[in-house]
Amino acid sequence: MHNDIIGYKYNDKIIDIQTAQEMGIENLEPIFFDNSSESLELIRHSAAHLMAQAIKELYPDAKFYVGPSIENGFYYDLKTEESITDKDLKNIEKKMKALAKKKIPIEKYYISMDEARKKFKDDELKQAVLDMINEDKVSIYKQGDFEDLCRGPHVPNTKYLQNVKLQKVAGAYLGGDSKNEMLTRIYGTAFATKEALQEYLKMLEEAKKRDHRKLGTELELWMFDEEIGAGMPIWLPKGTLLRGNLEKLLYSAHIRRNYLPVKGPELLRSHMWKISGHYYNYKENMYFTEIENDDPNKPAEEYGIKPMNCLSHVKIFGHKVRSYKELPLRFFEFGTVHRHEKSGVLHGLLRVREFTQDDAHIFCRDDQIEDEVIKVLEFVDAIMQRFGFEYEMEISTRPEKSIGSDEIWEKATNALKGALNRLNRNYGIDEGGGAFYGPKIDIKITDAIGRKWQCGTIQVDFNLPERFDINYIDENNTKKRPVMIHRAIIGSFERFIAILTEHYAGEYPTFIAPVKAIFVPINENHVNYAKEIQKELLNDDIITEIYDSSDSLNKRIRNAEKQKVGYVVIIGDEEVENDLVAIRDRKKREQYKLSKGEFVEMIKKLCEVKL
C-alpha cells in the first residue's frame, strides 16, 4: 500500500481524494501512504473517526464533539452514560483494528444546515458543533454505519488505519470553556507502518524515564505547591544552582555580543498596555490588579502584570534623544513574566504561568535589520551547538487577528527571509502563525530521543516604535523611526531547563550541573581530605558535596550515583596518603585515578565554558 495515493496538496493545504475529484483540478501534488507529516495528518484524522466508530458500536449511546489530528496523534471529545477509563482502551482498540481490516470505504456527502439541525436534533454535542459553522451547507463523512460532521480531509478507506494505539483517557471542557460540561477525551496515535508505530511507542517509554517532572523531584531541583498556586514553580537549592549556571553563561554571552543589561518593573499601568495593543489583543492572557490613586477623590487605577518585557525596553530607548550613531542598540533582560494558562494545559516547567525569558530587544535602522537578524541567528547556533541540539526554523506570517498595515507586515517578513537566505538556512513557513504585532522566526530544537520543541523566537516589529512614538536623529538631523527586533533564544529558562533535563536524562554537562562532583569518604578519617578539595573548588564557585553519613559505603555510592553527577569521587587511605582521588566517571562509564591537582584543574576547565 506504500505506493497508494491517499490525498493531495493544494495551495499548501491537504485535501482528500474525493475533495480533489469534486474540485476537478488536475496535476495536484499527491500524498502517498507513508509516514510523512502530510500522510500522518490524514491517517490520524481518520483514525479519530475510526475510534469514534468503534466506541459507537461498543457504547451505542455515545455522542461526539470534535476529533482532530494533533502533532503526535489524535483525540476525540465525547460523552457516554457508562464512564470510559484507561482500562477500556484495549477493548476499543481491538474493535478499531477489526473495523480497519474490513476495508470500509470513507465517503463524504453534503447536506444543508437545516437538514443537519434536524438530523442531529437529539445530539446536543453536534448542535454545539453546528453553532460554530457559519455556512449554508455542511459536509458529513461516512464509514459503514458511522457518520460525523467533519470538514476532512480523510483517507479513502479504513484499510489504511491498521497501525493505531490508544494512549490515555482525560477530561476536557466542552469547547475548552470551564463553564461548560466536562467531556471525556481519548488520545491516540497512528502511523502508516507497524515499525514506525513501535519506534514511536519505544520513544514514549524512554520519554517517561526522562520526564523532567519525575527527575526534578528525584534530583530535588524544583517543586510545585497547589497552596501557592498552579503553574508557579518553586526552585529548590540545586535547581537554583542549575538555573544560575545557565543564567551566568547566557549573561556573559550577551555582554560579549554588545548587549546592554536593563531591568523593567513587573507592574505597568494599563494605559501602557492599551497603547501597545496588548490590552485589546492579549488581555485574556494577562493578570490585572488595582492600585489606589494618589488623589483620594479619584478611583483606583488598573495595572497589568507584564506578560512580556518589551514595553519597558521601548521606554528605555525613548527616555532620551538617540542618535543614529548609537544604532543598533541592543537591550537584554532576564525578565520574569506572567501569562494566564488554563489549568488543563499546565505541564511541569514546560507550560507554566510564571516564567523568566532571555529577552532582548534590538533597535536599529531599516537597513540594519538583516545584519542584526543574522547576528541573532549566529547566536542561536552557538547556543544550540554547545548543548548538542539540532534545530530547525520556521517563519510565521500574519495571523487573522493582527495590527499594522499590509506594507509593514510584508517588509518585516521579507527581512526575516532575507537573513535566512543569506545564511543559506532552510526554513518552513507557518502561514498565519505570527504574533498579532509582527512576523517571527520560530526556533524548534530536536532532543536526544527525536522530539521537537518550540523554544526561541526572532521577531521584527515596526508597530511598537510607531505606537510609542520613539525616534532617533539621523545624519541629516531628522527624526526617524527605529525598527524593533524582539528575540528570545532559549524562550524561557523554565522551558529550556525542562528540555535540557529530558535531553540529558538529568545527566547535565559539568558546566551547568548544579553539583559538579560528590565525594564519598570510605570512613571518617578521609572526610577532612574531601573537605580540602571541596574548599579549593569552592574558591572558584564550584559546588561539590560530601556523602559522609553513617550509611554503608556501597549505599553512599549508590545514593551519589542516583544524583546523576558527572563524577563520584571515592577517597580512602591510598588517596589521602598520595594526594589522589579515585573517580567514577559517569559520562565515560569508567573508573580511574588522578592526582588531587589534576582533578581540580579538570573540573575547573570543564566549568570554563563560553558561548
Residue locations for each model-derived region?
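NTP/phosphate- and nucleic-acid-binding module
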Residues: 1-65, 70-611
